[in-house]
């Protein structure tokens, strides 16, 4: 998930992120991450499946559980093992992260996987596009 991610560094490796729009892990932090990485020169693609949840299913619903999805609106960027900041620039301590800053009591259910084949095709197409000779 993209609620916490490393600050961009120099890389030549293209990246693909696939998310279900209806997931208990919303796409927003991944879009924030992708934009930040693009500004640093990364080739990064984000594919959103509009009707899908976390499992690429259409039958999902939000349920009680525990998930690391509480920083979706302002994800935490890891600059090194001692420096963490939200995308908006607010410093966060490792202790805050360990104590559950980004956890919520929200989970997801539904595993009918209507978009799983499309997700697999998206991944295979991505690999074909970026295959090195």
Where are these regions (language model features)?
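The feature captures the conserved acid-bearing segment of alpha/beta-hydrolase catalytic domains
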Residues: 1-54
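C-terminal catalytic histidine-bearing segment of alpha/beta-hydrolase fold enzymes
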Residues: 43-133
């Amino acid at each position: 998930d993209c609620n916490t991610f490393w600050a961009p560094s120099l890389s030549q490796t293209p990246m693909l992120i696939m998310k279900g729009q209806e997931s208990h892990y919303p796409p927003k932090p991944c879009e924030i991450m992708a934009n930040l990485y693009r500004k640093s020169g990364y080739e990064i693609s984000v594919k959103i499946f509009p009707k899908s949840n976390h499992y690429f299913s259409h039958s999902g619903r939000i349920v009680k559980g525990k998930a690391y999805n509480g920083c979706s609106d302002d994800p935490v960027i890891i600059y090194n093992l001692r420096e963490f900041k939200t995308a908006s620039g607010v410093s966060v301590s490792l202790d805050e992260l360990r104590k559950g800053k980004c956890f919520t009591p929200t989970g997801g259910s539904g595993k009918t996987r209507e978009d799983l084949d499309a997700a697999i095709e998206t991944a295979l197409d991505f690999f074909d596009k970026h295959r090195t000779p």
